[in-house]
């Protein structure tokens, strides 16, 4: 064991290369996976991707992340093949014990960020009688390429995006593909007739979409994508009710089911004595391969001495000692939206807190937030990463304050979700292709109405709003106001 002096900063990684699950050799994303977000929206705020496919695949995302690391000279300060064994606070400093190549070392730091990710330890659904199954039983984490399953009868368990992706990936090679689901959410394609799915709405458009009647939304989709929606109804999978914002992105699963290429089965219950799967409707079938796609376990923080995950303010700052931050997805959320710009703005917030540029609330206020929001970590909820980016950007002071700089704030939220606009608001709003569904003029007044009389007076004097907008905002029923944070439904149906 050797003890090092305090160092400026290091990045410690367990695997031998950068890129996380997008590293083709990490065993993370399977070979044919591609981004659910387009090249226009998926990237970090200050690092556009250049000339890549509209929806980049594993190799392209890996090259992009490698370029980001090279740009920031991250490689020189990164220790690969290094496992963090323990983390403890001692004499005002964080002591990190690591293991690498058979050696243990300790390093001392003033501040620590945990960014381990969540897509590493897959959940396995309980299937009694597994010992009777003589075929191949793997998880989505083990799946890499469809050719290995040529000519097999395959059952996929799980109705999420991974299940839909892998089932569709297998169709050209397997003898048969079945998909066992408890329920399925709303599946829409990456590409709409008018452009990429994620270019359809601005941030404000997404907020208003959350409030839209589901039947009206489906009616609009019928008009926009009649062939797709006809196949959706033929598949029998169109939900009777869904969260409009909680979209599952996959353009193959619905046409494949409608064409009979994927057979939908109810929830798998157990194995029979003969090794067949018995479903909850009492039907039974035998399979050569079963692939479970039922999510991932919560990240394991047991290596942090004295840590309590329920005391993470806003899911990121440890209330008992905010010199420790966790930049991982909030646990048990069904997220939708671009992860990179979302984590980008959280990272900026963390660094501003660490540097003293930004302050967090008092400890008691943070504990109160945790008591209200972190008590039920296993309750599944929808998490709109785009709208959370706006909320966190305002909370952290990284986006223009609406009460003082409404014009720049408005130009961000009423524009499509391009990451560059978070750093430099456009001179004029760039609306999404489906924003015409909503009356932004009225929405603007509803947002202004929640700012209060003093802020409205200031904005009028500054010239950010007109006299007509000022008067209209004063007349709005407070119950009709829209928060500047752009709230949305977190119900996961």
Regions found by a protein language model. Give the residues of each.
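FAD-binding beta-loop-beta segment adjacent to the flavin cofactor pocket
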Residues: 24-37, 127-131, 280, 296-326, ...
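Feature captures the FAD/FMN-dependent oxidoreductase FAD-binding
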Residues: 54-121, 256-257, 270-275
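FAD-site-proximal beta/loop scaffold in flavoenzymes
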Residues: 136, 140-145, 275-279, 285-287, ...
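Rossmann-like dinucleotide-binding core of oxidoreductases
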Residues: 1-22, 66, 103-107, 112-248, ...
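Alpha/beta-hydrolase fold catalytic core
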Residues: 228-286, 290-296, 453-457, 462-489
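N-terminal glycine-rich dinucleotide-binding loop that anchors FAD/FMN and/or NAD(P) in oxidoreductases
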Residues: 26-50, 197-212
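Helix-loop-beta segment of a Rossmann-like dinucleotide-binding subdomain
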Residues: 43-57, 95, 150, 233-244
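C-terminal, flexible cofactor-proximal segment of oxidoreductases
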Residues: 186-189, 325-493
């Amino acid at each position: 064991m050797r003890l090092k002096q305090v160092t400026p900063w290091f990045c410690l990684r367990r695997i031998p290369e950068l890129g996380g699950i997008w590293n083709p050799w990490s065993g993370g994303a399977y070979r044919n996976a591609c981004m659910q977000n387009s090249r226009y929206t998926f990237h970090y705020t200050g690092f556009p991707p250049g000339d890549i496919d509209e929806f980049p695949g594993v190799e392209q995302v890996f090259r992009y992340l490698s370029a980001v690391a090279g740009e920031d000279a991250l490689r020189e300060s990164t220790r690969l093949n290094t496992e963090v064994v323990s983390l403890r606070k001692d004499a005002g400093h964080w002591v990190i014990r690591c293991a690498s190549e058979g050696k243990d070392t300790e390093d001392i730091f003033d501040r620590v960020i945990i960014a381990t990710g969540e897509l590493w330890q897959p959940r396995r659904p309980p299937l009694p009688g597994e010992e009777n199954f003589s075929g191949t039983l793997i998880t989505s984490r083990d799946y890499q390429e469809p050719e290995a399953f040529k000519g097999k009868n395959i059952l996929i368990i799980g109705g999420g995006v991974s299940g839909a992706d892998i089932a569709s990936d297998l169709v050209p090679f397997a003898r048969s593909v079945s998909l066992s689901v408890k329920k399925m959410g709303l599946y829409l394609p990456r590409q709409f007739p008018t452009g990429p799915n994620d270019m359809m709405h601005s941030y404000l458009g997404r907020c208003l979409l959350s409030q839209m009647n589901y039947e009206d939304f489906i009616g609009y989709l019928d008009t926009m994508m009649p062939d797709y929606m006809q196949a959706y109804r033929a598949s029998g999978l169109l939900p009777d009710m869904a969260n409009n914002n909680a979209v599952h992105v996959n353009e193959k699963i619905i046409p494949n089911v409608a064409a009979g290429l994927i057979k939908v089965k109810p929830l798998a219950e157990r194995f029979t004595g003969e090794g067949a799967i018995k479903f909850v409707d009492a039907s039974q079938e035998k399979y050569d391969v079963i692939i479970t796609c039922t999510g991932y376990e919560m990240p394991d923080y047991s290596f942090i001495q004295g840590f309590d995950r329920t005391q993470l303010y806003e899911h990121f700052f440890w209330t008992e000692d905010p010199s420790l931050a966790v930049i991982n997805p909030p646990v048990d959320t069904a997220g939708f939206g671009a992860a990179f710009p979302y984590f980008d703005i959280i990272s900026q917030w963390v660094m501003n807190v660490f540097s003293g540029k930004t302050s967090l609330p008092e400890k008691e206020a943070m504990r109160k937030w945790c008591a209200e929001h972190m008590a039920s970590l296993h309750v599944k909820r929808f998490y709109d990463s785009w709208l959370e980016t706006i909320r966190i950007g305002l909370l952290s002071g990284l986006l223009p304050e609406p009460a003082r700089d409404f014009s720049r704030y408005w130009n961000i939220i009423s524009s499509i979700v391009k990451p560059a606009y978070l750093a430099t608001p456009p001179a004029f709003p760039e609306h999404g292709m489906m924003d015409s569904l909503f009356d932004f003029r009225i929405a603007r007044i509803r947002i202004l109405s929640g700012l209060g009389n003093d802020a409205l007076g200031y904005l009028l004097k500054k010239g950010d709003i007109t006299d007509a907008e000022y008067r209209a905002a004063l007349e709005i029923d407070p119950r009709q106001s829209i928060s500047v944070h752009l709230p949305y439904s977190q119900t996961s149906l």
